[in-house]
Curated annotation (Swiss-Prot):
Designated name of the protein: FAD-dependent monooxygenase tpcD
InterPro entries according to UniProt: BBE, FAD-bd_PCMH, FAD-bd_PCMH-like_sf, FAD-bd_PCMH_sub2, FAD-linked_Oxidoreductase, Oxid_FAD_bind_N
Residue intervals of the FAD-binding PCMH-type domain: 75-246
EC number from the UniProt entry: 1.-.-.-
Length: 518
């Protein structure tokens, strides 16, 4: 209670000098901020490395703090303190102290980002949301109340008890909050749109410590801004997600060796699927070319929400030696639960590695995709020649995912979002260039390689008239500006909403992680 009284006094002082003055970060104040917070909240003061901290009380089996962060870049950050929050009121207290002292902070939801500062922060306050991970089905309302600290595996396993699910991520270890605030592609996007299009209500702590609900009828401008607009408006502590009936699904990974005939068949089949997808919105597809020690391989993920085995729309991906020039290496396709499929994909992204993603979007075209594959192979080989061949965890990946006409129509049916995409532009393909490696000493080689693939791909697409400016926030690198790609009208709207709900720029200036509105 003493701390709350102190905060009230601090707010009175701030109000007297004007509430619209922009805040500026002051890392030198963070020791005082952490001391203030330790009077009321569960706080662990900084050590020399994140692994020096005590175990989070919310983590079972004595897991280390570092295990809460997927990428090595996040694991190695050294915050001034770690704060465990157990309620929205705790979050409000952290924001109040940060605002009063100008100490920057980061919010850890699922901890799956590789962008520095996104979920762990050097010298500032790291807020652990792991305790806010409840998943409650409210069947009569047709929604699930999901804490912002939950991961998708937790959500799916709980809802499967009632044969229900939501539009969410495809890996069990990805956090709910980050994925939804950045848009969120899903196995169900062809029918229901992005994950953000399926949020009924957001529970949000604002910069002034107020707890509000953002919905279509309450704070509707904030509600729309949160649908793909990122973390510039507040800390979301709960998502109320629309639920629907879901039984067993059919799906899995189909793996082929990397050779020209396979590349041609997969890219052409992918583009054909992207055009035909509106005829069967219950299916989803992605493809990826990856490298691990031993060579390259193609993987195609095929999924059917109705549980149909090999639905006709996937005919072009059957094990046809005449088309592919070779047989599949393996297929994991089976009839199973969504959570099991999410577990399988999660195994492809082990924690503790260094990671960097970047992205671009193009009109779906097989010839362009084949060119991008060539650029990717060339840059991976250059990285191997520069010493990455000795890194057993070096795993570059080129991913392609369709943005189909039915997906973009579904987003409008469900109220729309701020990402600026139109169904007339479809089908599009989102390319993700995600490289994983072990050692900081190889950062420059990897980052240069990723940039070269991206630059060559964008240049080729522009030359062919196939470039689209959209950048998917959840795949965008730190030096990319996804919000800039949303279009002038949406950018101006987001600026107005930010000025209305955060006039001092707390979530712009004191939360450095994530993509901001420029």
């Amino acid at each position: 209670m003493q701390l709350l009284g102190t905060l009230s006094w601090l707010y009175a002082i701030q109000a007297s000098i004007g509430s619209s003055k922009a805040v500026t970060a002051d890392y030198g104040s963070c020791h005082d901020a952490c001391t203030l917070l330790s009077g009321t909240l569960s706080v662990e003061l900084g050590g020399s490395h994140v692994s020096d901290y005590k175990h989070y009380p919310t983590i079972a089996n004595g897991s280390s703090v570092a295990s809460l962060f997927w990428a090595q870049q996040q694991q190695s950050a050294q915050p001034a303190c770690l704060v465990h929050v157990y309620s929205p009121q705790d979050v409000a207290t952290v924001i109040s102290v940060s605002r009063s002292t100008n100490c920057p902070f980061a919010v850890r939801g699922g901890g799956h980002s590789d962008i520095p500062g996104a979920s762990n922060i050097n010298g500032g306050i790291t807020v652990n949301m792991a305790a806010l991970s409840n998943v409650e089905l409210h069947e009569s309302e047709g929604l699930a109340r999901v804490g912002a600290g939950a991961r998708w595996g937790d959500v799916y396993k709980e809802l499967e008890k009632s044969n229900k699910t939501v539009v969410g991520g495809r890996l069990t270890g990805v956090g709910v909050g980050g994925l939804v605030l950045g848009g969120g592609l899903s196995h169900f996007s062809g029918l229901h749109g992005w994950a953000c299009d399926n949020v009924r209500n957001y529970e949000v702590v604002l910069a002034n410590g107020t707890l509000v609900i953002a919905s279509n009828s309450s704070n509707p401008d904030l509600y729309r801004a949160l649908r793909g607009g990122g973390n510039s408006f507040g800390v979301v502590t709960r998502f109320d997600l629309d639920v629907f009936q879901q039984g067993p699904m059919w799906g899995g990974l189909h793996v082929w060796p990397f050779q020209p005939s396979v590349t041609s068949a997969i890219t052409r089949g992918f583009v054909e699927f992207a055009h035909n997808a509106p005829s069967d919105p219950h299916v989803s597809l992605f493809a990826g070319l990856g490298y691990k020690q031993g060579g390259f391989a193609w993987a195609v993920g095929q999924y059917d929400a109705l549980g149909r085995v090999e639905p006709p729309i996937f005919t072009q991906f059957k094990d046809d030696v005449e088309v592919y020039g070779t047989a599949k290496i393996v297929s994991t396709a089976r009839l199973t639960s969504l959570s099991d499929l999410a577990d399988e994909l999660n195994q492809s992204e082990p924690a503790g590695i260094r990671s960097r993603f970047t992205t671009a979007t193009f009109t779906a075209d097989a010839e362009l995709l084949i060119l991008i594959v060539e650029f990717f192979e060339e840059q991976v080989q250059k990285a191997l020649d520069k010493g990455l061949d000795k890194d057993q965890r070096f795993a570059p990946m080129l991913g392609i995912q369709p943005l189909t006409q039915n997906l973009l129509r579904a987003q409008e049916t469900r109220g729309g979002n701020v990402m600026g995409l139109r169904d007339l532009d479809a089908p599009l393909v989102v390319c993700s260039f995600g490289w994983e490696w072990s050692y900081e000493s190889d950062d420059k080689v990897v980052i240069d390689g990723i940039k070269a693939v991206l630059d060559h791909s964008v240049s080729a697409a522009k030359e062919k008239g196939l470039y689209h400016p959209f950048k998917y926030m959840n795949y965008a690198a730190l030096d990319q500006d996804p919000i800039e790609s949303y279009g002038k009208e949406n950018i101006e709207f987001l600026k107005r909403v930010r000025a209305m709900y955060d006039p001092e720029g707390v979530f712009t200036n004191l939360v450095p992680g994530g993509h901001k509105i420029n």
